[in-house]
Amino acid sequence: MGRAIGFDREKYIELQSEHINARRKEIGGKLYLEMGGKLFDDMHASRVLPGFTPDNKIAMLERIKDDVEILVCINAKDIERQKMRGDLGILYEDDVLRLVDVFRDRGFLVNNIVMTQLEDGNSQAEAFIERLERLGLTVARHRIIPGYPANIDLIVSEDGLGKNDYVETTRDLVVVTAPGPGSGKLATALSQVYHENLRGVPAGYAKFETFPIWNLPLDHPVNLAYEAATVDLNDANVIDHFHLSAHGESTVNYNRDVEAFPLLKSLLERLTGTVPYQSPTDMGVNMVGFCITDDEVCREASQQEIIRRYFKTLVEEARNGLDTTQSERAAVVMAKAGIKSTDRPVVLPARQKAEETQGPAAALQLHDGTIITGRTSPLLGCSAAALLNALKHLAGIDDELHLLSPESIEPIQTLKTKHLGSQNPRLHTDEVLIALSVSAAKDENARRALDALKELQGCDVHTTTILGSVDEGIFRNLGVLVTSDPVFARKSALYQKR
């Protein structure tokens, strides 16, 4: 039994590419299209809109790629703070390189990187710029503009956007993207419009922001899931009062777009003498809302995503010794959605197993609703146990049968503790999978269990203690959606190995 589908992927590709082409014709000249969210690997969208694939947006752009040039932004401050893409477990700066490779592999033109919010003394950002230039990429430096976005007189001047490097592009549709939010995509697009018009090149701006979905209600779980995903930015969905005033229609946008709209309107007025947009919603080209085929499926998926985001904030606060600001914001979003953390089906079974066994435990929900649990034993960690139990269930193997015998596990434990310096003899998920792969050469049951791995894609897991980076990474690679209680397995330890 697979995951329920609530979104029409093919309709989206067709409708969205047509709408972008229509906007290009309306604007005339060069169009800078800010791509909100992730252009590639949009895991969030695929979780809250079942049927939307992580590469949906890039597949849509492939329809018109001969007219497209990609411009990738990265915020210098994100390099300094070593910000990571949580869904992929890589640094933003590494993701810039990955994105360039992915775009080029799919036949897109991408030669330029924009370093935003660059300040003197940011040595890490400058080192990354040098690295990019050695790789043959052109890097534009964009500075912090005091008073952005409120000080319009300064922004639209030689001392504002005029101080930014101009990026020379060769195509009429320039897609501005980034590893994640807060990277400066809007400012980059506006800077380019400013510089193009100085050079006598007609240029305009439009925005493709998947979330919030403008034609869904403000409190729809899909839109609330976006708020939960951006608690670190303190973003909030709001009614677009500009659109309501201009068109008498209530639509949803997010606070930073609404706040920045007067800047965009003023910029376009000063540059071209005309204002094509009366509201932030007018700026957008998003057709996602028209491609939802089952609202209830998307509501349920989004509610589960909100809960996952809540647990994620709790774990990050525990790991990094942070205050509770972000988890409190996430809790507010849960309250708006009318849900609680235990509405995640795997939470209570994991906690009940932990209480029964007096040790860390895990619970995994299969696509048919079956809950599989795993306990901590002298041989296996709870995540590894739950993984093996799930594979046995999926492969139709008797629960009493050992896929890995104690005799096969003990040499691995000896290697870990006596030769590799580990204090924890229990096998992690990666070690279990390697052992299972070795066994599969001669054991039919092990072979069947390995074949069942693909059925874990999109399943949910909850653990009663914070996972280490190894188990977290294995689950991520398998496409399993993991949450944890904000408790360390060794509560008394000051240094918690990740």
Curated annotation (Swiss-Prot):
What the entry lists under InterPro entries is as follows: DUF1846, DUF1846_C, DUF1846_N
Q: Which protein is depicted? A: UPF0371 protein cauri_2449
Family of the protein in this entry: Belongs to the UPF0371 family.
**Lineage, highest ranks first:** Bacteria, Bacillati, Actinomycetota, Actinomycetes, Mycobacteriales
Q: Entry's Gene3D superfamilies?
A: dip2346 domain like, Domain of unknown function (DUF1846), C-terminal subdomain
